[in-house]
């Protein structure tokens, strides 16, 4: 099978270059593209690739239980391969135009299951080495922080796609839309569909206190422009929010996983929980505050623009 690694073809499978990390562009995306092409050639679905990535990641977590550097290195390799599969599932979905809410939910579940495996095995390793079982309490706090940080980063990264590329590129539905879908769907006969909407609702509701101004802005857009983002707002959002992408990415996968790898090689993996609780929470608090202030400014600009226009112009100012 001939595999084409032309740069433009790989870039066609990005969500958007603005939200891609350096290591993703030059490492995970090219490998993911190769895996996606291979998966397509043997007719694997994106969800199958996601499940394979989850299994690989869970096994890597188990290998972090052992004190042997050699075994830990194998675990690190498997975790990197799991990340490549995580990249490949989305690239395959975009390549085959088979993106779905089910795929997105499964992708999120996969990430949480992998880190659950890592957390549990790190705790068991710490206890096996003769230390306190209180490490589980620390791990639970770190896990809760991890969930909020990663959910926040993922939510606003999708928000960036919503405003800069358009609503159809955003993988997260609005709260009102999801509530309506949840009320309309019946558990009987539509269990899976309703469960997917339920998971996404819980995800959005868990971020309510961190996304107040953003919800005001999106509600205004839905009401006035019917989700047709005006070009001036798209440009202003990109100019103001593009620098925030580094914080979104810092709070999701790569930074925490490479920190974990370094601590494993230093034989101090328990410090990973401290990194989660202290360093990443400081980054999160700073980024969340900065994001809220930037969005408030965009809300004030949007209100000023819409208040000063006749109704007819409001509907014409669309992309």
Where are these regions (language model features)?
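C-terminal membrane-associated helical module and adjoining short loops/tails
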Residues: 1-30, 158-319
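Transmembrane alpha-helical segments that form the membrane-embedded catalytic/substrate-channel core
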Residues: 81-87, 144-160, 282-293
């Amino acid at each position: 099978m001939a595999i084409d690694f032309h740069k433009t073809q790989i870039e066609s499978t990005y969500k958007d270059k603005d939200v891609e990390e350096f290591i993703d562009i030059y490492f995970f995306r090219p490998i993911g593209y190769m895996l996606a092409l291979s998966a397509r050639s043997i007719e694997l679905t994106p969800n199958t690739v996601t499940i394979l990535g989850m299994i690989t990641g869970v096994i890597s977590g188990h290998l972090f239980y052992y004190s042997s550097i050699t075994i830990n290195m194998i675990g690190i390799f498997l975790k990197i391969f799991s990340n490549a599969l995580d990249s490949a599932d989305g690239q395959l979905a975009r390549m085959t135009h088979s993106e779905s809410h089910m795929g997105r939910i499964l992708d999120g579940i996969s990430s949480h299951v992998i880190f659950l495996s890592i957390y549990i095995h790190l705790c068991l390793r710490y206890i096996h080495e003769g230390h306190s079982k209180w490490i589980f309490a620390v791990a639970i706090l770190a896990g809760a922080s991890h969930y909020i940080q990663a959910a926040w980063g993922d939510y606003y990264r999708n928000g960036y796609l919503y405003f800069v590329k358009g609503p159809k590129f955003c993988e997260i539905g609005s709260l009102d839309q999801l509530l309506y879908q949840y009320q309309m769907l019946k558990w009987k006969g539509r269990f899976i569909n309703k469960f997917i909407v339920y998971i996404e609702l819980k995800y959005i509701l868990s971020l309510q206190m961190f996304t107040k101004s953003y919800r005001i802005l999106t509600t205004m857009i839905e009401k006035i422009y019917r989700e047709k983002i005006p070009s001036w707002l798209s440009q202003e959002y990109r100019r103001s929010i593009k620098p925030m992408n580094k914080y979104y990415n810092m709070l999701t996968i790569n930074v925490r996983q490479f920190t974990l790898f370094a601590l494993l090689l230093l034989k101090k993996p328990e410090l990973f929980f401290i990194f989660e609780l202290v360093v990443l929470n400081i980054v999160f608090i700073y980024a969340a505050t900065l994001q809220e202030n930037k969005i408030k400014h965009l809300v004030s600009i949007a209100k000023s623009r819409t208040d000063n226009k006749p109704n007819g112009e409001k509907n014409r100012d669309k992309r």
